[in-house]
Amino acid sequence: MEKTGITALLRSVFTKDEDFQRVLAHICHTVAKDGSHISCDDFVSRSFLSYVVPDVPLQSLYSDTKYFSDLGRDSMKVSLMKGYVEMERSGNKDFGSGCYVDSTPLPNDIDIPISALCSHGTGGCEMQARLAVCLDSASGLPVWYSLFSGNIQDMSTLMDEIDDAETSVGVSIDDLVLDAGYITKELITAYNADDRFVSFTGRMPARKGFPFRTLYHRCGGSIHQAKYFFDRNGHTYFGRRFEDVLFGKRVYLYVYIDRDRALSLGRSYRQNNRDEYEALSDKEKNWLEVKNGYFVLVSNIDSTPAETLERYFGRMDIESFFKTSKEYLSLLPLSKWTRETIEGKLLNDMISTIVYLKIRKALSGTGLSMSKLFGRASSLMCTRKKDGTVIVEEANRQVKEIFKAAGIKIPSSLDLEEFEESCLLKPRKKNMK
């Protein structure tokens, strides 16, 4: 965090020692707990971190409603995200000059206050909220986000989010990644009419006005031709591209069949619904063999089916970075969740995500996974002496190899006061020459 400038950024926003120490504790916990269910107070109490956050009562880190509420203020979000973009631009002037928008539904196990009743993609009506994220196209790092009710973005909501990102942190959106149910006549027309959007890719819904089933018939017998097959993540896909006009606009339609999924689910249906299956016509049986793996992407990018699918799925992976599981969110009493605490939790996770991605990038090429780094590194023990010196135990061979690969030198001891000064936890006592 110190090497990437994140520590200095946080210090510039959180000027009080206790506030700064508190945000460090929460971010370190979010990043380094590595999927475990350990609470923040337990995590800090068992680590070196407890030595450098002395102003924070450990028991207050368990639910910490005030922290998330304070972090959820709009001014805090703008200060942190704007400062982050400026920090990145100091080393890369093009950072944020081209971004794409992705989104993911949030679980409602904690009754998110702004959730709205909807049935989009759920198989029934339920309360949902959605998180839209703007990411820098070159680095994939998040630069802005918005939380809204329901599970479908209409055009006005989407434009508000885009304008908000441009106004608040000065990033420009030129690419849109849209998931199931997003492609509408209104959106297709707007994307083509607005020259800010260099590209867009979205999934075609199976409803009236769209050639969803027509494209299946258009493919005909080619769905069995090997020249249209390609492999991705252990699955074999049929993929074919068509150039066409949709709502008066020239677009590219990419027709896919996940052959493995279609075969598996088709077999399951036949085995469990034998009488119904036998009653189907030959055409209906043929459709049943592919329908569970069939989907269509709509884009204004002329590419190959394999490249388009990789681009679409690759940019849909953003939800994996956000820790919105029931286990973590339920640490706060349900009665304490408000719009501000939800926003604060998301901002905490956004900053943590940036830190996580930067660590992962630094490890690329070393052969180290994040889990291996945090798992092995956490076994290294230390003790603090009365004079403030921290004695670090002799690391075993495996731990030494981990730290060496990560480019980190293991000290035999360190001066706690000097460490706190170097990490901006305390002001320096003397001017540096």
Annotate each predicted stretch with a short phrase.
Residues M1-Y100, T104-I110, C134-N151, V390-K433:
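Dynamic "connector" segments at or just before major functional cores
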Residues M127, S146-L147, F197-R311, S379-K433:
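An anionic, glycine-rich sequence signature occurring as long contiguous blocks
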